[in-house]
Structures are given as structure tokens and as C-alpha cells.
Regions:
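Short acidic-hydrophobic catalytic motif
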Residues: 11-231
């Protein structure tokens, strides 16, 4: 981003913020939602009904979940260090409290470029709704987003970073780049779907082009999902 910056360094990336807020563009600022909203539904894995209340949050809060059904009303930060499970869904845990199947809601928040929000839940699992991010995006659009007078924190990597999970046959590579770009390739080893490829050069296209993508599974996977209490 253009404008004055302040940087810190690590072995893998620079951290910097845009200091010249007068000349900063909309994307340089943190955002929250304008007002509270409520979303209810059932979890796809637990089958339990859950109600979520999404609330505006102060700058630098980040994305936080709160289990209001628990006596401690534990807050769980949406942080990679809190990820404890990724089998068919993503689960976060903090101080013994869990929140699961967060990925579609998280995608909607990223697509809407929302930085700060508190999500209260009266159960463990985020509702699946129609199996995509689109219902979350539509509800967030109804209340709108609010620009906060606080700069975003940016991470700029200095060299290639590679992550490989041999068991799940996943490889991710982050490359230094002057702009935003995500390139994905997936092969389901199936004659029905085959190999699929997508290239996203601007997060602004998420709502129209990606949010409606839905969860699915193959028929031959059903037995394993049932045996592992995932459906």
C-alpha cells in the first residue's frame, strides 16, 4: 500500500501499517459491522440448533467467538494457534472451549473485509445454512460495514514459504508479490469433477464469484463420515 509506513522485521515477513491516514484508501483502514445481527440454524456435523449474534467490535479486536452457553462464556480468538482440528471442518479451541465449522463464516468476513467482530454462540458449531458463505455475506450486507479510524496491519513476506501435508496431500506456497493473488488447483481423483483450477486477483470478487460455492461430499465418503460422527 502507498503512503508512509512503519515496519518491523522477522525472518519470513515484514509487518507494517499505513501511517498517512489522510491519504489512505478505504482498504487501508480496519472495518467492523454497523450494527448487531442474528443468524440461526443447525450445525451440519452436530445437528444441533444454534443462534449466533454478530456484534461490532473495537479496532484491533480481531475476529472473536464467544461461547455464551458455557458458564465461563469463553472467548476464542480466530487465530491459527487456536486451530485444533481440520477434519472436514475447522475447529478452534481456547481454555477448553471449542467452536467448529467456522470456515464459511470466516470466508464471508474476509470477503466483506471485516477486521473486528464479536460472534456470540449458544452452541459449539456455526450453523451450516445452505452449505456456502453466501447467506452470511447477504446478512452482513444488510447491516453494512463501518470504517474505523485505525490502520490495518499488513504482512509482507520476504521469501517463498511452503507448507506440505503429506497425509492430506496438500501443498501451499506463499510467494512475495506486489499485489493480491490466490491461485488454487485441486484434483478429486474423480471422473465426475476431475481437476479444477481458480485464480483470484482481487478479494472484491469473492461475494459474486466465490461465496456461493457449497460444501459437498462423494457417496463413497458417507460411511466414513457416519462412522466418525461427522454427519
Amino acid at each position: 500500500p502507498s503512503g508512509s509506513t512503519e515496519r518491523t522485521k522477522s525472518d519470513s515477513f515484514h509487518t507494517f501499517v499505513v501511517m498517512d491516514l489522510m491519504n489512505g484508501t478505504e482498504e487501508h483502514f480496519q472495518h467492523t459491522i454497523k450494527e448487531e445481527l442474528t443468524i440461526s440454524g443447525a450445525g451440519i456435523h452436530t445437528g444441533q440448533a444454534v443462534t449466533m449474534r454478530l456484534k461490532p467490535a473495537e479496532p484491533n479486536t480481531g475476529i472473536q467467538f464467544q461461547r455464551i452457553d458455557l458458564p465461563e462464556k469463553t472467548i476464542i480468538k480466530a487465530d491459527v494457534d487456536n486451530v485444533v482440528e481440520t477434519n472436514r471442518s475447522t475447529t478452534l479451541e481456547s481454555n477448553g472451549a471449542r467452536v467448529s465449522t467456522i470456515e464459511h463464516l470466516m470466508a464471508a468476513l474476509v470477503g466483506m473485509q471485516i477486521d473486528n467482530i464479536l460472534i456470540e454462540l449458544d452452541g459449539e458449531e456455526v450453523p451450516i445454512l445452505d452449505g456456502s458463505s453466501e447467506p452470511f455475506v447477504q446478512e452482513l450486507k444488510k447491516v453494512g460495514t463501518l470504517k474505523q479510524n485505525t490502520p490495518k496491519i499488513y504482512y509482507e513476506i520476504k521469501h517463498n514459504i511452503t507448507f506440505i501435508d503429506e497425509d492430506k496431500k496438500v501443498e501451499m506456497v506463499a510467494l512475495p508479490y506486489h499485489d493480491y493473488r490466490i491461485n488454487t488447483l485441486i484434483d478429486f481423483n474423480s471422473p465426475v469433477l476431475g481437476t479444477q483450477h481458480a485464480d483470484m486477483k482481487n478479494i472484491a470478487v469473492f461475494n459474486d464469484q466465490i461465496a456461493s460455492s457449497r460444501t459437498f461430499c462423494f457417496f463413497h465418503e458417507l460411511e466414513a463420515l457416519l462412522n466418525n460422527n461427522l454427519i
